Amino acid sequence: MSARVEADDWVYEMFPKDTPPDACGSFASFKRLWDSKRKGEALPAWKDYQLEDFADWYGWINVEDIMPGEPFDTVQRLWGTNLTTAFGKDQTGVRMREMKGSVYSDTDFDMRTKMVETHDFRICYGPANWSAQESWKKTQKQSYIELPLADDGHTVDKFIALT
Protein backbone atom coordinates (compact mmCIF):
# COMPACT_ATOMS: atom_id res chain seq x y z
CA MET A 1 0.00 0.00 0.00
CA SER A 2 1.46 3.33 -0.99
CA ALA A 3 0.95 6.74 0.57
CA ARG A 4 0.36 9.58 -1.88
CA VAL A 5 1.04 13.30 -1.41
CA GLU A 6 0.34 16.00 -3.98
CA ALA A 7 2.16 19.33 -3.63
CA ASP A 8 3.38 22.04 -6.00
CA ASP A 9 2.09 20.21 -9.11
CA TRP A 10 4.07 17.12 -8.06
CA VAL A 11 2.88 13.68 -6.99
CA TYR A 12 4.94 11.84 -4.37
CA GLU A 13 4.18 8.19 -3.66
CA MET A 14 5.80 6.31 -0.78
CA PHE A 15 6.01 2.52 -0.89
CA PRO A 16 7.11 -0.10 1.67
CA LYS A 17 10.52 -1.57 0.84
CA ASP A 18 8.96 -4.99 0.13
CA THR A 19 6.75 -3.65 -2.67
CA PRO A 20 7.13 -5.94 -5.71
CA PRO A 21 9.14 -4.42 -8.58
CA ASP A 22 6.26 -4.86 -11.02
CA ALA A 23 4.28 -2.32 -8.96
CA CYS A 24 6.92 0.30 -9.86
CA GLY A 25 5.94 0.74 -13.51
CA SER A 26 8.83 1.88 -15.71
CA PHE A 27 11.15 1.67 -12.69
CA ALA A 28 10.57 -2.08 -12.16
CA SER A 29 14.02 -3.14 -13.36
CA PHE A 30 15.75 -0.57 -11.13
CA LYS A 31 13.72 -1.73 -8.11
CA ARG A 32 14.55 -5.33 -9.03
CA LEU A 33 18.27 -4.44 -9.01
CA TRP A 34 17.90 -2.78 -5.57
CA ASP A 35 16.06 -5.87 -4.26
CA SER A 36 18.82 -8.13 -5.61
CA LYS A 37 21.38 -6.28 -3.46
CA ARG A 38 19.38 -6.71 -0.25
CA LYS A 39 20.30 -9.40 2.25
CA GLY A 40 17.03 -10.52 3.81
CA GLU A 41 15.36 -7.53 5.46
CA ALA A 42 18.55 -5.46 5.32
CA LEU A 43 18.91 -2.54 2.93
CA PRO A 44 21.63 -2.64 0.30
CA ALA A 45 24.78 -0.56 0.71
CA TRP A 46 26.36 1.66 -1.94
CA LYS A 47 29.40 -0.67 -1.88
CA ASP A 48 27.15 -3.56 -3.00
CA TYR A 49 26.86 -2.02 -6.47
CA GLN A 50 29.25 -2.21 -9.41
CA LEU A 51 29.39 0.35 -12.21
CA GLU A 52 28.17 -2.31 -14.63
CA ASP A 53 24.93 -2.59 -12.62
CA PHE A 54 23.91 0.79 -14.01
CA ALA A 55 24.70 0.16 -17.70
CA ASP A 56 21.06 0.73 -18.72
CA TRP A 57 20.89 4.01 -16.81
CA TYR A 58 24.27 5.73 -17.21
CA GLY A 59 23.82 9.46 -16.84
CA TRP A 60 20.44 9.26 -15.08
CA ILE A 61 21.62 8.13 -11.61
CA ASN A 62 22.26 10.28 -8.59
CA VAL A 63 23.50 9.21 -5.17
CA GLU A 64 23.29 11.40 -2.07
CA ASP A 65 25.06 11.05 1.27
CA ILE A 66 22.99 11.95 4.33
CA MET A 67 24.80 14.56 6.41
CA PRO A 68 25.08 13.89 10.15
CA GLY A 69 23.18 16.10 12.59
CA GLU A 70 20.24 18.45 12.34
CA PRO A 71 18.63 19.88 10.34
CA PHE A 72 18.26 17.07 7.81
CA ASP A 73 20.48 17.54 4.76
CA THR A 74 22.24 15.52 2.06
CA VAL A 75 25.11 16.14 -0.35
CA GLN A 76 25.27 14.88 -3.92
CA ARG A 77 27.95 12.18 -4.19
CA LEU A 78 27.17 11.31 -7.81
CA TRP A 79 25.19 13.39 -10.31
CA GLY A 80 24.70 11.78 -13.73
CA THR A 81 25.76 13.52 -16.91
CA ASN A 82 22.24 13.47 -18.37
CA LEU A 83 21.01 15.14 -15.17
CA THR A 84 23.70 17.79 -15.61
CA THR A 85 22.42 18.50 -19.12
CA ALA A 86 18.81 18.70 -17.95
CA PHE A 87 19.55 20.88 -14.92
CA GLY A 88 22.13 23.00 -16.68
CA LYS A 89 24.87 22.34 -14.13
CA ASP A 90 26.67 19.56 -12.34
CA GLN A 91 25.24 19.22 -8.83
CA THR A 92 27.98 16.87 -7.54
CA GLY A 93 29.06 18.10 -4.09
CA VAL A 94 26.01 20.35 -3.69
CA ARG A 95 23.90 20.09 -0.54
CA MET A 96 20.16 19.48 -0.68
CA ARG A 97 19.53 22.65 1.34
CA GLU A 98 21.38 24.68 -1.31
CA MET A 99 18.83 23.44 -3.86
CA LYS A 100 15.77 24.06 -1.68
CA GLY A 101 13.14 25.95 -3.61
CA SER A 102 14.67 25.27 -7.02
CA VAL A 103 14.97 21.48 -7.01
CA TYR A 104 13.77 20.34 -3.58
CA SER A 105 10.64 21.35 -1.68
CA ASP A 106 9.58 21.08 1.95
CA THR A 107 7.73 17.91 0.92
CA ASP A 108 11.04 16.39 -0.21
CA PHE A 109 12.62 17.09 3.17
CA ASP A 110 9.62 15.65 5.04
CA MET A 111 9.43 12.51 2.93
CA ARG A 112 13.15 11.83 3.03
CA THR A 113 13.17 12.14 6.81
CA LYS A 114 10.38 9.55 6.85
CA MET A 115 12.34 7.30 4.44
CA VAL A 116 15.26 7.29 6.89
CA GLU A 117 12.93 6.14 9.66
CA THR A 118 10.79 3.62 7.74
CA HIS A 119 13.11 2.39 4.95
CA ASP A 120 10.31 3.12 2.48
CA PHE A 121 11.10 4.28 -1.04
CA ARG A 122 9.34 6.78 -3.26
CA ILE A 123 8.35 7.41 -6.84
CA CYS A 124 7.72 11.03 -7.78
CA TYR A 125 6.59 12.83 -10.91
CA GLY A 126 5.76 16.33 -12.00
CA PRO A 127 6.76 19.27 -14.21
CA ALA A 128 10.41 20.02 -14.91
CA ASN A 129 10.25 23.44 -13.20
CA TRP A 130 13.94 23.18 -12.31
CA SER A 131 15.11 22.72 -15.89
CA ALA A 132 17.78 24.97 -17.29
CA GLN A 133 16.04 24.64 -20.64
CA GLU A 134 13.21 27.18 -20.52
CA SER A 135 11.09 25.29 -23.07
CA TRP A 136 11.10 22.21 -20.81
CA LYS A 137 9.56 23.98 -17.83
CA LYS A 138 6.04 23.82 -19.28
CA THR A 139 6.32 20.84 -21.62
CA GLN A 140 8.53 18.23 -19.95
CA LYS A 141 7.62 15.95 -17.08
CA GLN A 142 10.12 14.35 -14.78
CA SER A 143 9.75 11.13 -12.85
CA TYR A 144 12.15 9.33 -10.59
CA ILE A 145 12.44 6.51 -8.10
CA GLU A 146 14.44 7.07 -4.94
CA LEU A 147 15.58 4.23 -2.69
CA PRO A 148 17.42 4.17 0.65
CA LEU A 149 20.87 2.66 1.13
CA ALA A 150 22.58 1.66 4.39
CA ASP A 151 26.21 0.66 4.88
CA ASP A 152 25.22 -1.46 7.89
CA GLY A 153 21.97 -2.67 6.30
CA HIS A 154 19.80 -0.77 8.79
CA THR A 155 20.84 2.88 9.28
CA VAL A 156 19.99 4.81 6.12
CA ASP A 157 23.03 6.86 5.11
CA LYS A 158 22.43 7.39 1.38
CA PHE A 159 19.74 7.65 -1.26
CA ILE A 160 20.05 6.36 -4.80
CA ALA A 161 17.73 7.68 -7.48
CA LEU A 162 17.00 7.03 -11.13
CA THR A 163 15.40 9.82 -13.16
Task: Please annotate each region the language model reported.
Residues 1-3:
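Intrinsically disordered, low-structural-confidence terminal and linker regions
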Residues 5, 10-18, 25-163:
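Sensory/regulatory domains in signal-transduction proteins
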